[in-house]
Amino acid sequence: DEAALRRGPAPEDSPSPRRWKFSELLSEPAVKARWERVRQYFFLRESTYDMTNRCNLRCDGCYYYEGDKQFARENGDPQAWRELLRRERSRGITYVVLAGAEPSLVPDLLDVCFGEIPLGCIATNGFRRIDPAVGYRIHISVWGNDETSRRVRKARELLRRQIDNYRGDRRAVFVYTFTRENIEEASEVMDLLAAADCRVTFNVFSAPVGYAGGLRHDAESLVRTREVMLEMMSRHPRHVLFSPYNA
């Protein structure tokens, strides 16, 4: 009829995409080798804990003090933490992230956590050294050079102090957080950290709700951040722990 003529001939049925079986994917040697490298970590089940509402720095744009968590009642009882970690372990938690506000201020609680669940990491500003007996990975936040740290984090010579505290410590990974203002400082900071044989990874500042300060990224700064990340990976391949897939 006339309507059918206007529509034209019906398109041929397109074949359905093939549904691959996992075993078929693993039959490819390269895929199988990559699978075997990562499957050993499948037992990890992570949970994050804020250790204290105290901090020895006051950083612009801090996620902890921009939100309601700062008003939570602090529990500094080691036995209470021991019981909590045992309950967490019984429900399958195998990896802990110890954060907020500054966990290095409660060293006795870090000891307790490590004694119950020995896999994990601590997010710290690096101002105080954490006892080597606590064998967690240590993630040390870096927001720029010492001048920027003085302005943004109200701390003098913070990068120098961080390096002094953790130089040669195999637990330590310095986390350079890119903000809109510190992108061009990354080269200077990376050179200092690499010269001290410190390992580094990258982070991108994520503004807390309601924050409109100068650290907040825009589209242009995010593009430049990616460029600098790739430059630093190329310049310091032995010291940067990062993947181009994440840049």
Residue ranges and their predicted role:
Residues 1-5, 90, 136, 141-247:
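Radical SAM enzyme [4Fe-4S]-AdoMet core and its adjacent flexible, acidic
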Residues 5-132:
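Conserved alpha-helical substructure of the radical SAM core
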